Amino acid sequence: MTGREHLYDLIKESFLLLDFGDRTLFERYGLSVSRYYALHHIAGNPGLSPSRLSQLMFCDKSNITRLLQGLEADGYVTRHVHERDARIQRLFLTDKGLRLHREVWTVHLTFIEQRLGLLSSEDSQQLETTLDCFIRALAEARSLNG
C-alpha cells in the first residue's frame, strides 16, 4: 500500500467512525443522518430552496424530493411558494421541526465536543488546518472537473 492509499484509508475510516457515531445518535430521535442534516440546513437558512438544499447535501434533486416528502409527512418541514416566483419553493421548519432540531442539535454539539476533545488543542488545530487545505483542494478539483 502506498502512502497516499494509506492516507486515503485513514480519512475514509475517520469518516466512517464519525458517521457511525452520528447515525447511532440520530437514530435515538428517529432521524437518519440525511434527515438530521436537512433539518439542520433548513434551520440555519429558513426559506432555503430544495435545489440549494440538494447542493449543500451533495445529492440529486430526486433524493431531496423524497427526503422532504418524508420530513413533511412527519410534520417537521413545510414548503411555501416563493413570494415573487411561483416556480420556486421555500423550505421552513415547523414548530415541531424546530423543537426536534434544537433538541438533537444540542445533544449533537455535546457529542462533537466529547469526540473532538480526545485530541489535544495542538492536534486539533493542526488537523483543522490540514483539513481546511484538503477540502479547498477537493472543491477546486471538483469545480474544474464539472
What are these regions (language model features)?
Residues M1, S121-G146:
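C-terminal regulatory/oligomerization modules of transcriptional regulators
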Residues M1-Y29:
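N-terminal leader segment of winged-helix/HTH proteins
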Residues D19, Q69-T129:
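Charged, amphipathic alpha-helical coiled-coil/dimerization segments
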Residues Y37-H40, R99:
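Pre-recognition alpha-helix immediately N-terminal to the DNA-recognition helix
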Residues N45-S49:
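Short capping segments at the starts of secondary-structure elements
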Residues P50-S51, S62, Q69, Q89:
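Residues within helix-turn-helix
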Residues S54:
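The alpha-helix within a helix-turn-helix
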